[in-house]
Amino acid sequence: MRNNFFLLCLIFQGVIAQERDALLEGLFEDEMSIEQQVLPQKMIFTQSVLWGKNGLFRKTGISKLSIAQRQKELKVRNVMLKTHQIIGYLTLAGMVAQGIMGGRLYNGDYKLYDTHKTMGEWVTASYFTGAGLSLFAPPPLVRKKIKGLNSIKAHKWLAYIHFSGMIATNAWSKEDRDWHKYAAYTTFASYATAILVFKF
């Protein structure tokens, strides 16, 4: 009888322990759903590395994942993307000036070479600063999937072209004048179009 009572107590303890474990698991599942609510399902690689669930800022404790912290991150995102936009306009103006000077250089006005070179360095720096602000900004709460072509998709596709073009323009600046010119025109056209698609 005593052995039966001991066995019954042991079984009862096992049942209580399982219920307690199930309750704790439920709590952790709720925490996971909070993480899923504050981070989008998909992020670009650069955002994931910094701002993802296991990103650098989470691991180092710079930006712990919570609803309050995500609200702060969204404010940072807003500032970064507005700055990206302003730098984008300045870069476009610099590209126009570069195109004018470049055309004069091709027509034999070599006194503009140093100015063109210096302006090219400034345009390159502003371009990659603006790109960095976009690529490293905290992710949005939700990434909306929109079927078909829209201004955001067009802006991103054009970014592949002008990003590659900017690298090619700089790579060919001393190597091949013709390819430098073609890369610069391609970069300018795709960059200007990427800005215009957001306006219309």
Where are the regions a protein language model picked out?
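N-terminal targeting leaders of membrane proteins
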Residues: 15-114, 133-147
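Low-complexity, compositionally biased segments
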Residues: 6-7, 24, 33, 119, ...
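Hydrophobic alpha-helical membrane-anchor/signal-helix detector
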Residues: 77-106, 115-138, 153-174, 180-200
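Bacterial Sec-dependent N-terminal signal peptides
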Residues: 1-19
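Juxtamembrane helix-capping/reentrant segments at transmembrane boundaries
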Residues: 146-154
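Generic intrinsically disordered, low-complexity segments enriched for polar/acidic and small residues
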Residues: 2-3, 9, 25, 42, ...
